[in-house]
């Protein structure tokens, strides 16, 4: 025979299961990293694999591309890191380190997943060689100056030729 006590017990279990059902999706959502958190995790991996003396820290994060909602699908990322003053052997977070004056800058591209439990990344970084950028600026400015000078020379030749043509007196 069923007692009132059994009814309360069944009601409690139902309530526990209902609450558990409501909390589980929140736990799953909490395991999804934000775009920036996934990039910071990738930078931690870059620092672990690096043979450079100092840690790198996020300098610039390109805007987040439009993405699907699946946290297991690799998402494209691109960002720039800069060398900090903290040695790689330190246990300090790169975010707590100051950038090194004239520190090495690297441009990084690849993919990250936002699933915290199975988070992965495939990132490659190249030195952001400012010398080549400066060389490009030099050639662009030189081209502009040469173009202006060329136009000036052409105008002087035209003026000279106009003056050579015999003038008729009226």
From Swiss-Prot:
Concerning its family, UniProt says: Belongs to the cathelicidin family.
- InterPro entries under this entry? Cathelicidin-like, Cathelicidin_CS, Cathlecidin_C, Cystatin_sf
Task: Give the highest taxon in the source lineage.
Answer: Eukaryota
UniProt cross-references to Pfam families, sorted A to Z: CAP18_C (PF12153), Cathelicidins (PF00666)
In the record, the effect of residue 157 to K is given as:
Loss of antimicrobial activity against M.luteus
Where is the stretch described as Active core?
Answer: 150-162
- Disulfide-bonded cysteine pairs: these are 86-97, 108-125
Which terms in the GO cellular component ontology are assigned? cell projection; extracellular exosome; extracellular region; extracellular space; specific granule; specific granule lumen; tertiary granule lumen
Effect after changing residue 149 to A: Disrupts oligomerization. Loss of antimicrobial activity
Q: Where would you find this protein in the cell?
A: Secreted; Vesicle
Q: Which residues form the propeptide?
A: 31-131
Query: Disulfide bond: is it a keyword of this entry?
Result: yes
Q: Which GO terms describe its biological process?
A: amyloid fibril formation; antibacterial humoral response; antimicrobial humoral immune response mediated by antimicrobial peptide; cellular response to interleukin-1; cellular response to interleukin-6; cellular response to lipopolysaccharide; cellular response to peptidoglycan; cellular response to tumor necrosis factor
| Outcome reported for the amino acid change (mutating residue 160 to A) | Loss of antimicrobial activity against M.luteus
Report the protein name in the record. Answer: Cathelicidin antimicrobial peptide
């Amino acid at each position: 025979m069923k007692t009132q006590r059994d009814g309360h017990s069944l009601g409690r279990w139902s309530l526990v299961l209902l609450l558990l059902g409501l909390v589980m999706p929140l736990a799953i959502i909490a395991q999804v990293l934000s775009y920036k958190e996934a990039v910071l995790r990738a930078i931690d991996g870059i620092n672990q694999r690096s043979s450079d003396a100092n840690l790198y820290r996020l300098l610039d994060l390109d805007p987040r591309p439009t993405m699907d909602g699946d946290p297991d699908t690799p998402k494209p990322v691109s960002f720039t890191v800069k060398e900090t003053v903290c040695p790689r052997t330190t246990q300090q977070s790169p975010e707590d380190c100051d950038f090194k004056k004239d520190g090495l800058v690297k441009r990084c591209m690849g993919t990250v997943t936002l699933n915290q439990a199975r988070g992965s990344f495939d990132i490659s970084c190249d030195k952001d060689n400012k010398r080549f950028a400066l060389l490009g600026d030099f050639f662009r400015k030189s081209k502009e100056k040469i173009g202006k000078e060329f136009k000036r020379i052409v105008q002087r030749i035209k003026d000279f030729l106009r003056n050579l043509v015999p003038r008729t007196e009226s």
